[in-house]
């Protein structure tokens, strides 16, 4: 294998879990001496135009044949079957989560994403996923043989334990882009019924990826009378994000589905108690003793979980201790990068 050509659509600097994973692979490989480079693809994926597809074809076909193509699933899952077939024998597909499981799609759109991604994955020599949950999902619903799928869980860096706010008001923190799948509307609906309790919520995440969702969330916050208690912080730099984690008393993740849930391990690394859903891999990412878990999309269950933890500082401390204990066993990025590089080496033409 001469090198890994890592094809990634859109802006690699965007503050999402998927792009963070991709950035970290490239950074680790540089330190490890693994020959790898980033091949930018158009930003129109997963709904590319004909121009996007033509540009993608030119970019990929211009790569040396002895390099292995590692293609982010945001693009590869949307490739027409004819394009995927033409790359057979050279591709490792990186699936963060199946495209058809994104919330907010019509049934027709979701079915088309599933059909196209299933067809493309048939031609991938190997598939890398970020969780055992996604591996099982690809085997069950996308006809991908389990022996072709390798799990490379995201790593996490060691961090200082969160000190918390130190006040009587419980500081809630949620991290993730404002997109339908993150379930922030469910969180606000749950908190609406807890106005008599002492809490404040900060949501950190890009607010420009789904403008309609952001507008609806802002309107919901205003309509529920929670504007003074809910802060939409937008995307933050690393120092500001670290400060938000350090000041938090409880981490909340109301996602409807997660292919892994990298923010959960970031919370664990800082010893934060967690309230999360069982959507996708989230139920496995956070240990049961560190996280109170509720079904995704269930306003009543989320409200009950919030009330329980807001009312019981002792339980929050116990779950915080469990999270801090789990932090020492979390995977590191060097191991993640090694696993993916080994998969690519086996596929090298």
Give each language-model segment a name.
Residues 108-127:
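Membrane-proximal helix-turn-helix segments that form the acceptor-binding/catalytic region
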Residues 163-182, 188-193, 202-204:
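Conserved donor-binding/catalytic core segment of Leloir-type glycosyltransferases
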Residues 264, 273-276:
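Short hydrophobic beta-strand element within catalytic cores of glycosyltransferases
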């Amino acid at each position: 294998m001469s090198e890994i050509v890592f094809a990634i659509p859109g802006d690699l600097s965007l503050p999402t879990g998927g792009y963070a994973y991709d950035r970290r692979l490239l950074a680790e490989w540089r330190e490890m001496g693994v020959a790898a480079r980033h091949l930018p693809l158009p930003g129109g994926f997963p709904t590319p135009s004909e121009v996007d597809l033509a540009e993608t074809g030119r970019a990929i076909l211009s790569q040396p044949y002895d390099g292995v193509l590692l293609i982010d699933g945001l693009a590869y899952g949307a490739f027409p079957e004819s394009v995927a077939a033409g790359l057979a024998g050279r591709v490792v597909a990186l699936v963060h989560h199946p495209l058809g499981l994104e919330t907010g799609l019509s049934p027709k759109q979701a079915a088309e994403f599933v059909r196209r991604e299933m067809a493309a994955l048939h031609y991938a020599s190997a598939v890398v996923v970020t969780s055992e949950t996604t591996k099982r999902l690809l085997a069950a619903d996308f006809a991908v043989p389990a022996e072709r799928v390798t799990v490379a869980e995201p790593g996490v860096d060691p961090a200082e334990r969160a000190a918390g706010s130190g006040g009587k008001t419980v500081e809630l923190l949620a991290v993730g882009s404002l997109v339908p799948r993150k379930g922030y509307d469910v969180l606000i609906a749950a908190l609406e019924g807890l106005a008599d309790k002492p809490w404040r919520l900060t949501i950190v995440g890009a607010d420009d990826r789904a403008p309609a969702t952001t507008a609806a969330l802002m309107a919901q916050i205003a309509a529920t009378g929670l504007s003074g208690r809910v802060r939409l912080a937008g995307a933050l730099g690393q120092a500001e994000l670290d400060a938000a984690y350090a000041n938090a008393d409880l981490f909340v993740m109301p996602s409807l589905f997660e292919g892994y849930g990298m923010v959960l391990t970031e919370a664990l690394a800082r010893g934060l108690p967690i309230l999360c859903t069982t959507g996708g891999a989230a139920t496995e990412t956070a240990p049961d003793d560190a996280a109170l878990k509720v079904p995704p999309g269930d306003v009543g269950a989320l409200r009950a979980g919030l009330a329980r933890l807001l009312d019981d500082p002792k339980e929050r401390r116990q779950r915080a201790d469990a999270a801090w204990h789990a932090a020492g066993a979390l995977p590191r990025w060097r191991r993640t990068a090694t696993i993916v590089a080994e998969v690519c080496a086996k596929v090298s033409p």
